[in-house]
Amino acid sequence: MEIVKRAIRLMHEGKCIYDQFQLDEDYNVPDAKEDVGNVIEGTVCVKTEDMKLVETYLKISGKAQFKILYMTASLDPQPAVLEGKLPFEEMVYVEQPGEEEYFLKNLRTEFSVSMVHSRKLSLHLLTELEIGRTQMISEEVTEDVESEHAVYKKMKKFRLLGLSDTKKDTYRIKEEITLPGTKESISQILLSEVSGRKLELRPGTDEVTVRGELQVFCLYLSEELKADWVSQVIPYEGKLLCNGLTEGMFYSVEHTLEDTLVDIRMDEDGEMRILGIEGTLLLRMNFYEEQEMELLEDIYSLQEQCIPEKQETIFEELLMQNQSRYKLTERLSLPELKDDVLQVLCSRGEIQIEHTEYREEGIQIEGILHLNFLYLRGDDARPYGSWQGMIPFQHLIECSDLPENVRCTMSHHVDQIQVSMAGSEAVEVRAILAFDAFLRREIELQTIVSVMEKPLDLEQMDKRPGIVGHIVQEKEDLWELAKQYMTTVEGIMNVNELENENVKIGDKLLIFKENMSIL
């Protein structure tokens, strides 16, 4: 007897690993730079360059690239910028390491700069890491059996979710901004911010359409050494090749915008009025498709004894692919700013998830939006300032009748953020927080892995009654009765003149042994 099997691929996600580390360094101002009068703000981008498992530890190394915006200590203070890198190496303990792939799922930083004196700064960096772990596995289901003898099969329909493809790829973004006519030409870039928003992926035939926007802010010095800025949203769209994909597939994506660059370019008139914008979108994509199939649940034969060996296997069923958006609106009273703020120039935010709870109505998320904004002041000696704080939030990703045995892959990011003045001592924060959830339900199947064949015990068969009267009990069906009394479903239906296989509790049936001469 030969078993016909079919393989289904699954992406198993292990428990995430959380780590936190700090870097404290003194930074000496280079000789080519002017003395520091006051620090406006510091920004940092932490990039991991290598991640590998060493026994029971994950060795993570990389660099923290920072920029410090400050005002010079000259008689005529001017904005200036300092740049540098802080290398790091972190050993993270891993519980029960296996043949899994480890990757950086989320990263959040807190960077502060304080003056020791005009030629030395003290840098403090706090970094929080969330490390994901995944392993692709393959499980088999039994669709059929092939035998020399006549066999009777009990089949059941299932709709299972299978991993179609997994892909790590990069999408390179190259765009340009032309300064409006009211802006002066650029001499030097002081500070630039490039963040992604409204990212949308759409699977097609052998390709993935990537669509999104870049929020760009640039603070610069003009040719007359006057500070100015430009802020603009740039849309982008492109395609990535991915053989085997079809339109309508389900997907789960982790994405990060890295290696952003803003440089000055010359326009057709020879003036420095164009900003080149570049960035690399790192994508970890898992594509899934639902597969409808009939699986073999049980088997018997009237010519031999069939003993199936079963194995418990966990598969997945799609619950929901959800792109949930939470609109946050908050008015912050900031008396410490008083009448200091003339205009908010640039704002940025990061999400920190504090607690996730699975409820019957969906997934309840509690977290914090860490907020930072750069603003323009009315003081010519100190024309810029920055503020940072946090806003708590709660959000429900709705999914009615959420089962207990649920698997969830979730990513989050700030899709949009805007800070505007709301009076002399207050600001209004408007943000859209994105939560992309891919929900699956665990299905426990008893899969037939082999069938043992034995000759029938003819002596026992002869002792069986030739005719049996049976009253249908709870959870019984015609197939189970046919197997129990060594007959066929068709035989029971013919004798009892049944039009279909549906029977209910209390029905009275007359059952004949299939090999009796009366039949």
Regions found by a protein language model. Name each.
Residues L456-N494, E499-L519:
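Primarily a LysM-type cell-wall glycan-binding module
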Residues M1-K463:
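Interfacial loop/beta elements and low-complexity acidic/Ser/Thr-rich segments
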